[in-house]
């Protein structure tokens, strides 16, 4: 499914909230992990010499490498290769560049983290990556204030699993082949996280409900044939984004899996507005696949 997993971190406890998913998902997917920390130093600081700026950059690089090695130490039992990348530059640009080295790379990122000289405004970084990357993307939304760092102390897989908040995966579909591209990704995550799947199809008209229910029943059978838990699907009506957000409110602790359609690059999406709204306003973690 994936040849590599990229995990951007900024050193904050909020950014580290993605780590339980990295541990548990990597146990199932068995793909190499690359931990990334990006730091930036202003090119021109009034009254500060170039030598001083270079020294600061070297200190930040050493700090990034040290932190990433500490995180790597928590991943010794995942059964796959773990590498680290500490790099100077714009956080979103570096993450996208690293991800696009391989099209089958998935980016797993927390949507918030502290801002500051060496830390990112993670909400902004995650949004930029979401808009620009062609790679699959898992966005974990922070749900709590910062506490103790997740890289402190010893934890086994059971301990990491206990930290997961996702208890269900909502698979959003509109019946198109593009929207269905998210299905194998959702199935892979359901297997790794050991959670049920809830497929939903957004309909323009109640007159189509019979066809939509048949579509969902076939998908439910497909999931069950793969030994995945699925209690049934649901047909939604109305504005697609609003309907999906309402489902996340009725089924809390859900991961929303969806395909976005639109241009890659820094430009805004053309057809990805539904995904955009759901990611921004649902408060739920999201697995986003760019349709091709």
Q: What role is predicted for each listed range?
A:
Residues 1-51, 161-211, 217, 221-234, ...:
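Small/aliphatic-rich secondary-structure junction motif
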Residues 1-17, 80, 106, 127-181, ...:
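Intrinsically disordered or low-complexity boundary/linker segments at protein termini
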Residues 1, 73-107, 146, 225-256, ...:
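Structural beta-alpha unit
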Residues 106, 110-132, 146-147, 259-281, ...:
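Glycine-rich, Arg-bearing micro-motifs that act as flexible, cationic patches
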Residues 71, 78, 86-88, 97-110, ...:
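Hydrophobic, ordered structural segments
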Residues 7, 25, 33-35, 67-68, ...:
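Short, structured motif recognition centered on aromatic/hydrophobic residues
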Residues 53-66:
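A short acidic, glycine-rich active-site loop
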Residues 24-25, 215-216, 224-227, 237, ...:
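C-terminal functional regions that serve as terminal interaction/effector modules
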């Amino acid at each position: 499914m994936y040849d590599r997993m990229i995990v951007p971190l900024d050193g904050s406890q909020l950014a580290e909230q993605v780590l339980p998913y990295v541990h548990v998902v990597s146990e199932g997917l068995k793909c190499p992990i690359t931990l990334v920390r990006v730091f930036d130093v202003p090119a021109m600081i009034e009254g500060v010499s170039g030598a001083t700026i270079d020294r600061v950059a070297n200190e930040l690089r050493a700090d990034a490498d040290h932190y990433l090695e500490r995180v790597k130490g928590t991943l010794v039992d995942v059964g796959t290769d773990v590498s680290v990348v500490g790099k100077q530059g714009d956080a979103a640009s570096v993450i996208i560049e690293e991800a696009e080295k391989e099209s089958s790379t998935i980016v797993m990122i927390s949507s918030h983290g502290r801002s500051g000289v060496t830390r990112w405004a993670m909400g902004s970084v995650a949004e930029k990556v979401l808009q620009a990357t062609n790679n699959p993307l898992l966005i974990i939304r922070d749900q709590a204030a910062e506490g103790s760092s997740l890289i402190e102390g010893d934890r086994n897989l059971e301990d990491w699993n206990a930290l997961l908040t996702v208890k269900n995966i909502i698979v959003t579909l509109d019946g198109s082949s593009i929207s269905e591209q998210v299905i194998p990704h959702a199935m892979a995550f359901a297997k790794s996280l050991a959670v049920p799947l809830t497929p939903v199809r957004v309909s323009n008209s109640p007159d189509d409900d019979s066809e939509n229910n048949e579509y969902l029943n076939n998908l439910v059978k497909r999931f069950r044939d793969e030994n995945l838990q699925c209690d049934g699907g649901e047909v939604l009506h109305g504005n697609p984004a609003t309907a999906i957000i309402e489902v996340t409110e009725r089924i809390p602790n859900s991961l929303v899996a969806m395909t976005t359609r639109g241009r890659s690059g820094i430009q805004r999406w053309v057809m990805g507005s539904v995904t955009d709204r759901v990611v921004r306003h649902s408060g739920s973690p999201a697995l986003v696949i760019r349709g091709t």
